[in-house]
Amino acid sequence: MPLNVLFIAVDDLRPEIGCYGAAHMKTPHIDKLAEHGLLFERAYCQVAVCNPSRNSILSGCRPDTTGIFDNQHFLRGQMPDVVTLPQHFKNHGYTTLSLGKVFHHSEREPGDDPQSWSEPAWYHGDPYKHWFTKESLDYVKQLKALPKDKQPKQLRA
């Protein structure tokens, strides 16, 4: 029986979680996953922009090979025949699911790379908000209703 694989990638996350020694952060579930799984201690992103970095990780190709250096280009538009990491797992009998913002896609490509996923990725309808849950969007609306001096400094959504 094949092992289960849970791949978690987070944009803009510094190592400010317990398993990386940040005692002031309370992250018990992530810490437990790290304790019983594989924790990378020397991992580096290929580029400081989320879409090209994720495409690099998931394709195994550097950005100079994918040709993606911004958030406006799509992996299949640049490399239509590349076999992605989830696609490799899918081709070998695994069920692969996309939760959150994995590949950037447009309204023209709402499936978020169907070659890679066993089921279509959930799509919100707005190409830049599809990874938010309804609860997250409601919370952002509440924050936006606050006086400007009480809002977070970088409120986007």
For the regions a language model picked out, list residue spans one by one.
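Formylglycine-dependent sulfatase
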Residues: 1-157
